[in-house]
């Protein structure tokens, strides 16, 4: 039993190390193609690696040459059989809600010489326009002076703790080598809980208040007293009719 538990732990650690190295490899190789993450699926026949990027054509390359090069490098690094692994490219549908894509876009803007404030606000506007609930961009390093500091740009609503941070917030960290030194980029995007496809669709403290119904006239419940009153009213209304009938008969 102990050996079985240890083997499970070793397998989990090995899978985690494999995923971390694979993610680091694709982050380094596919930075220009808008790399946004990787998904590993194990099937009985082969290992499927799904690469998510904004530019899938750049991942595939001309006549599939680039993806074959990536496959050969992974096979050589992890000592896998060429027939036992398959790499697929998947396009990121919502680029504005992917923190990795926006971090790479911000990195490209900084390398092109765009001012830091203008580049950061461009990311904020693009993400909020795509339907994000909140966006936060932090850039740290030697921004203007010789002393390093950090600047934070935020828009919308953002949470910082608890399980909802795992459910609704996407985080990406990148580093860019500038002339004055290395700058750190951190992008946090909070997705709209109502548009969440998988998992909860609302925050834990969200309260839904039902709309008030129209106030109709309330009819009181009948009682014994009301029945008696109704009977007396009926006898009073019937008495004059009987008297008129007797007068007509005598005439």
From Swiss-Prot:
InterPro entries: KH_dom-like_a/b (IPR015946), KH_dom_type_2 (IPR004044), KH_sf_prok-type (IPR009019), Ribosomal_S3_C_sf (IPR036419), Ribosomal_uS3_C (IPR001351), Ribosomal_uS3_euk/arc (IPR005703). The keyword Lipid metabolism does not apply. Coiled coil: none annotated. Pfam families: KH_2, Ribosomal_S3_C. Residues 22-93 form the KH type-2 domain. One of its GO terms (cellular component) is hyphal cell wall. GO terms for molecular function: DNA-(apurinic or apyrimidinic site) endonuclease activity; RNA binding; structural constituent of ribosome. Its main location: cytoplasm. Keywords: Cytoplasm, Ribonucleoprotein, Ribosomal protein, RNA-binding. Residues 232-251 have a biased composition (Acidic residues). SUPFAM superfamilies: Prokaryotic type KH domain (KH-domain type II) (SSF54814), Ribosomal protein S3 C-terminal domain (SSF54821). GO terms for biological process: cytoplasmic translation; maintenance of translational fidelity; nonfunctional rRNA decay; ribosomal small subunit export from nucleus. It comes from the Eukaryota. Residues 223-251 are annotated as: Disordered. Disulfide bonds: none annotated. Gene3D superfamilies: 3.30.300.20, Ribosomal protein S3, C-terminal domain. The keyword Cytoplasm applies. Component of the small ribosomal subunit. Mature ribosomes consist of a small (40S) and a large (60S) subunit. The 40S subunit contains about 32 different proteins and 1 molecule of RNA (18S). The 60S subunit contains 45 different proteins and 3 molecules of RNA (25S, 5.8S and 5S). NCBIfam families: PRK04191.1, uS3_euk_arch. Component of the ribosome, a large ribonucleoprotein complex responsible for the synthesis of proteins in the cell. The small ribosomal subunit (SSU) binds messenger RNAs (mRNAs) and translates the encoded message by selecting cognate aminoacyl-transfer RNA (tRNA) molecules. The large subunit (LSU) contains the ribosomal catalytic site termed the peptidyl transferase center (PTC), which catalyzes the formation of peptide bonds, thereby polymerizing the amino acids delivered by tRNAs into a polypeptide chain. This is Small ribosomal subunit protein uS3.
């Amino acid at each position: 039993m102990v050996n079985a538990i240890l083997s499970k732990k070793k397998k989990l650690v090995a899978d985690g190390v494999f995923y971390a190295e694979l993610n680091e490899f694709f982050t380094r190789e596919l930075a220009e193609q808008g790399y946004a993450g990787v998904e590993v699926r194990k099937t009985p026949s082969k290992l499927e690696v799904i690469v998510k990027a904004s530019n899938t054509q750049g991942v595939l390359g001309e006549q599939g040459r680039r993806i074959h090069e990536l496959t050969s490098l992974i096979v050589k690094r992890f000592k896998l059989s060429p027939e036992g692994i398959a790499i697929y490219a998947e396009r990121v549908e919502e680029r504005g809600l992917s923190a990795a894509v926006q971090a790479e876009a911000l990195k490209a803007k900084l390398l092109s010489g765009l001012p830091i404030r203008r580049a950061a606000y461009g990311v904020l506007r693009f993400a909020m326009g795509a339907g994000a609930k909140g966006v936060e961009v932090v850039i740290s390093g030697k921004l203007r002076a010789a002393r390093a500091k950090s600047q934070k740009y935020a828009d919308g609503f953002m949470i910082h703790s608890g399980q909802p941070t795992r459910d609704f917030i996407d985080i990406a960290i990148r580093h860019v080598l500038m002339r004055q030194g290395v700058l750190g980029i951190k992008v946090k995007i909070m997705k709209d809980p109502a548009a969440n496809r998988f998992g909860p669709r609302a925050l834990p403290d969200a309260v839904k208040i039902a709309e008030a119904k129209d106030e109709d006239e309330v009819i009181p419940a009948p009682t014994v007293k009301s029945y008696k009153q109704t009977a007396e009213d009926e006898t009073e209304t019937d008495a004059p009719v009987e008297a008129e009938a007797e007068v007509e008969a005598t005439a």
